[in-house]
Amino acid sequence: MNIENINTLGELVKSGYKSKSIKDELRENLISKMMSKETVFKGIHGYENSVIPELERAILSKHNINLLGLRGQAKTRLARLMVNLLDEYIPVVEGSEINDDPLNPISRFAKELINEKGDETPIYWLHRSERFAEKLATPDVTVADIIGDVDPIKAANLKLSYADDRVIHYGMIPRANRCIFVINELPDLQARIQVALFNILQEGDIQIRGFKLRLPLDMQFVFTANPEDYTNRGSIVTPLKDRIGSQILTHYPEDIETAKTITKQETDKASAQKEFIQVPELARDLLEQIVFEARESEFIDAKSGVSARLSITAFENLLSTAERRALLSGDSKTMIRLNDFDGIIPAITGKVELVYEGEQEGAQVVAETLIKNAIKTLFPTYFPEIKKLEKQSAETPYDDIISWFFNADEDFELLDEHTEQEYKNELDKITPLNAFLEKHQPNMNTVDGYFVKEFILWALVEFKKLSKHRFAEGTQFRDPYGNFMSGL
């Protein structure tokens, strides 16, 4: 059907166009995509076997949907991607405030226009990208905002009495007729406003200021909400929950690979930095492990959640830390160092909600602890495990490295201002590290190897095999008894 040649109601009827409800559109287009094995929700990772099948079932059932989950779980993005399941264009009566269907008008304006002009009634075609409306539920939202109200200025200009329904100013919901309408953070909507949604969800009509006005709106509602026990500002009233067809629980990525995919997708915009900053795979793993540690931490409120935005902003900070270092040292290319992870602490402290014990420790200490715990968790997946209880005489794969520090003439320091070559030269001084890497990670990329060497040193500190001291200009590593001996 060539929509460019269809500009009036008569031409639309001749074309054989048949109108259908928005929920039928979503259902039919979903079926078509599923049959052709097309990816429906592109850019959503980790939900393939959990959330997406439930969402598809809800669409097939023609339900209004509530996406329930913690912060940063792609709830709003899922709702926005549903637009791709709509028909590309639909006809609308020209001049209609509420997107009237020319074949099934519901407003007084559209009905009178069609009665007056008949087949010559002008129409225009609305693209699916314009069929998405979104409202963030805030405590100051009123019924007039979302449903509508009497407009006294309109009444005065048109010289109409308040008894005439033409004085109505429609709110966001009627104006989103034949659209997907999303209300974010539904529990924040006052209970009396939630009550105003009852009729729309069940009967599809609205009531404005006592007008006996029946508008059978055709809409797909999607709500998003945090779990009630976390949202202190309110809850979803029970009769409203009863009218929402499907409630779908979202979740965080369940493994590091999925989390890495999400972070990479969301940070690909920073391509200018990536041209001269190399990011070892281990650094990506470590960054995601920090977020996983945060979700399990006793210092962080689990009910609040740890958003996927943490790993995204932390990765951006990590790149910027390396970029700043390279600019100051004059390096044209650089790679991520473990010292650079100090730069992600502001991203962590701004994204986590601490419990009482965490407040006592302090946000900075909690963030540093998360980095240390992530190193301890990841280390055994790459290298031999360091057991807590070992016989004093037992040999370990790390003995040569530890002995090097014991016999070193001076403390080993990695300065923040080291150029790339100076950094590599310093790590190359620890000759046992090279032999250790060749034995346990023979396929390791040579350049990534320097980050891995530093990672080994940090891990040995966490397992009490070495000691580490952070000072203003960098980090100092020494034999575990070095601090004790220097104090004598």
Spans of features found by a protein language model:
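Short connector loops/turns at beta-strand edges and beta->alpha or beta->beta junctions
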Residues: D151, F292-E293
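Short alpha-helical scaffolding segments that buttress acidic/His motifs in well-ordered protein cores
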Residues: T263, L287-V291
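Amphipathic alpha-helical interaction surfaces
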Residues: A58-S61, N84-E88, E203, E293, ...
